[in-house]
């Protein structure tokens, strides 16, 4: 038991070290950018583009089931993290004022999040979406973009001081499990068979990319003007 506890403490210490190595690399420009990137509503245009791809490639009934599947994936991921796991693990966020390291943590706009952060809902939700789309389309560049998008979301949470890397890894696993389960349920219910040729998959990449460019410009304006 002692050896197990020592190993666990070693992982916690490593997690904290990695957290600080990321959180300490900050400046005003990226404070604005990461804060904007970590937002939820700013990604609505990209979500609309994903819906557009479904509408252009699937029957409306399949599209409806896809949207329900995505909603269930995100609901599962969010509830698994916030309701089922966090109250039992009770790992405080690094930014929480009751955490001894909180005074050394760089935060943005005085945002500290809730009390507990393991697992990360942001990681679970974004990777749940990313993995569901991977299972659904299996398109290389869309997969690369959406996985990079989810990964940068995770990075932003450490940068903003509200999550340890371990929180994000656990959230990613929750998102993967949720996406895998709901996708296979979706296939069983809808009889979905992946089409050989899927069109308009660049739409989410374009809209998501333009959104990121907009954030970069916004951060520049707030920093230098």
Residue ranges of each PLM-predicted region?
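Hydrophobic alpha-helical transmembrane segments
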Residues: 37-54, 68, 122-127, 145
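Membrane-water interface at transmembrane helix exits
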Residues: 51-55, 77, 81-90, 134, ...
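Interfacial segments of alpha-helical transmembrane regions
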Residues: 51-80, 142-144
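Membrane-embedded catalytic cores of phosphoryl/pyrophosphoryl-handling enzymes
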Residues: 106-225
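Hydrophobic, lipid-facing residues on alpha-helical transmembrane segments of integral membrane proteins
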Residues: 41, 68-80, 84, 169, ...
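N-terminal signal-anchor transmembrane alpha helix
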Residues: 1-6, 65-88, 212-218
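N-terminal transmembrane-helix/juxtamembrane module of multi-pass inner/ER membrane proteins
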Residues: 1-46, 81-111
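Transmembrane helix-loop junctions in multipass membrane proteins, especially transporters and channels
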Residues: 55-59, 87-95, 162, 166, ...
